[in-house]
Amino acid sequence: MKIFLDTADVEEIRQGVAMGVVDGVTTNPSLAAKAGRNFRDVVLEIVEICPGPVSAETVALQADEIVREGRILAKWAPNIVVKVPLMAEGLKAVKQLTSEGIKTNVTLIFSASQALLAAKAGATFVSPFLGRLDDIGQDGMILIRDIVQIFKNYNIQTEVLAASIRHPVHVLQSALAGSHVATMPFKVLQQLVKHPLTDKGIETFLVDWQQVPDAATVFAE
C-alpha cells in the first residue's frame, strides 16, 4: 500500500519524504488555508520535494469552471493530480480532464456507489473518507472493502485512496481491506513509527553496548 501525506505543510512533507516511505501528497482548501501561504507557491514547493502524485483541489462548482481550474493546476507540474469533489458537475469535469490526459482524484466520497461513478468517469483515484464516517457512527472500513471488491469484480484500474485518517489503526485497517493508498496527517505517520517496546529495546541495547570493550573506538575512522 502506498503512503501519502495529507498536509500542505512543506516542512512536514520534507521530513516525511526524507524517511523514504512517502509516495505522494494530498492537499485541500482547508489545508491550504492552514498553511497561510500563497497556494501556488506551496504546491510548487511540494512537487519539488515529492516526485510522486500531488493532489491539488479545484474550488469551482460548474463543470466548465472545474475543467478550467484543473487545466491550470495540471500545468504547474507533471505530477499534479487534480482533486475534484464528488458531484454531478464534478463527474462531467473528470470525464473531460481524463480525456485530456489529466490525472484526477475524486474526493469527499462516502458511498461505494459514488466511488463506482467516479471510476466510470475515469478518476485516477477515489478518496473515501473514513474519519468523517466514524464521526456519524458508520464503519468507514466497510466502505473501503466494498469499493475494493467492486473494483476487483470489474477490473477497474482506479486506485482506492483511503482519506480522513485519524490514527494508526485506520492505516492498518485500510491496508488489510486492500486500499491502494492511505493518506494521513504527518502526526499519524510519526505514530506509525513509534512503539514503546521498540524504544525500550533501543535503550537496552545502548546501555549494554557500553559494556563492550572497544565500544568507544569500534566505529572510529
Swiss-Prot record:
CDD domains: Transaldolase_FSA (cd00956). GO terms for molecular function: aldehyde-lyase activity; transaldolase activity. Belongs to the transaldolase family. Type 3B subfamily. It catalyses: D-sedoheptulose 7-phosphate + D-glyceraldehyde 3-phosphate = D-erythrose 4-phosphate + beta-D-fructose 6-phosphate. Its main location: cytoplasm. Gene3D superfamilies: Aldolase class I. The keyword Transmembrane does not apply. One of its GO terms (biological process) is carbohydrate metabolic process. SUPFAM superfamilies: Aldolase. NCBIfam families: fsa_talC_mipB. It is found in: Cytoplasm. It comes from the Bacteria. InterPro entries: Aldolase_TIM, TAL/FSA, Transaldolase_3B, Transaldolase_3B/F6P_aldolase, TSA/FSA_arc/bac. Keywords: Cytoplasm, Pentose shunt, Schiff base, Transferase. Pathway: Carbohydrate degradation; pentose phosphate pathway; D-glyceraldehyde 3-phosphate and beta-D-fructose 6-phosphate from D-ribose 5-phosphate and D-xylulose 5-phosphate (non-oxidative stage): step 2/3. This is Probable transaldolase. The active site is at residue 83. It holds the Pfam family TAL_FSA. One of its GO terms (cellular component) is cytoplasm. Transaldolase is important for the balance of metabolites in the pentose-phosphate pathway. Its EC number is 2.2.1.2. PANTHER family: TRANSALDOLASE (PTHR10683:SF36).
